[in-house]
């Protein structure tokens, strides 16, 4: 994947399509969004509020870690707590009612390095203190592929992360604190999530982005093969009662659907047709 891992936001391109909300009275909790400010692009509270004002009734949102507003100093293990402090500040702004009825960042999922083993408990407790009662869990990415050009350089875990003893030692600290785990992996690692869920049946696991089916580089042109492997892995994962799956996140470049290459954004019908095989 050449260039930046993330696509630039093209407001002029996005403006080429507008559709009315399908069910404007349906209450929605957005379970997965980020807030950040990076060089050349910004998506903070006001940008999120602009998107929320497009006709849907979004009553609350859940903030998911994205390496945003980390602490600038102090022990490295505790720097991700800065992101929880930031998200909780946004939540407090939203809770004032000044910005409208949506409870933004009503839930917060942060990051902690679970390979710290049992020592990660201090970091988890710091997140809970910083979260103002909103902190719900940890995301520690296991998204790895042998092709380094597919991997996100911001989250470049070693292969087999979820099965490593030090990771599992840290993972064991989640359930006693009532915390869940957000699993962000590519589809070849779904069996690792299944093994983790079976080893820790008391821990709630949320699989991100439908398991991250890949469709670029060596996976390009192999959709039937990828889907067969993905389907088999997801069927096995479905036997774990402590796992839930987020239905979304299929429009990224790594999925290979090519939406970003169109003259205009895809319609809701086009998105539904493309996503249907991964969600039915």
Please place each PLM-identified region on the residue numbering.
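Catalytic pocket-lining loop regions of alpha/beta-barrel enzymes
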Residues: 157-280
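Mid-domain alpha/beta scaffold segments of enzyme catalytic cores
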Residues: 1-177, 199, 217-221, 227-228, ...
């Amino acid at each position: 994947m050449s260039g930046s891992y993330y696509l630039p936001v093209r407001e002029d391109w996005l403006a080429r399509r507008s559709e009315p909300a399908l069910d404007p009275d349906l209450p929605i909790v957005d379970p997965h969004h980020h807030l950040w400010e990076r060089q050349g692009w910004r998506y903070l509270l006001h940008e999120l509020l602009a998107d929320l004002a497009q006709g849907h009734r979004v009553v609350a949102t859940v903030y998911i870690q994205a390496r945003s507003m980390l602490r600038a100093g102090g022990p490295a293990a505790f720097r991700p707590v800065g992101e929880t402090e930031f998200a909780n500040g946004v939540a407090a702004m939203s809770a004032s009612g000044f910005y409208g009825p949506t409870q933004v960042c009503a839930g917060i999922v942060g990051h902690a390095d679970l390979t710290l083993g049992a020592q990660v408990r201090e970091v988890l407790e710091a997140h809970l203190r910083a979260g103002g009662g909103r902190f719900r869990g940890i995301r520690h990415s296991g998204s790895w592929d042998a092709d380094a050009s597919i991997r996100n350089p911001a989250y470049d875990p070693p292969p087999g992360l979820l099965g490593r003893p030090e990771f599992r030692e840290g993972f064991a600290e989640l359930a006693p604190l009532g915390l869940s785990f957000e699993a962000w992996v590519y589809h070849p690692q779904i069996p690792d999530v299944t093994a983790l869920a079976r080893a820790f049946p008391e821990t709630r696991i949320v699989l991100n982005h439908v398991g991250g089916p890949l469709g670029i580089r060596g996976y390009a042109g192999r959709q039937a093969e990828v889907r067969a492997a993905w389907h088999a892995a997801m069927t096995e994962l479905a036997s774990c009662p402590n796992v839930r799956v987020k239905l979304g996140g299929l429009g990224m470049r790594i999925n290979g659907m090519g939406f970003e290459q169109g003259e205009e954004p895809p319609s809701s019908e086009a998105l539904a047709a493309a996503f249907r095989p991964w969600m039915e």
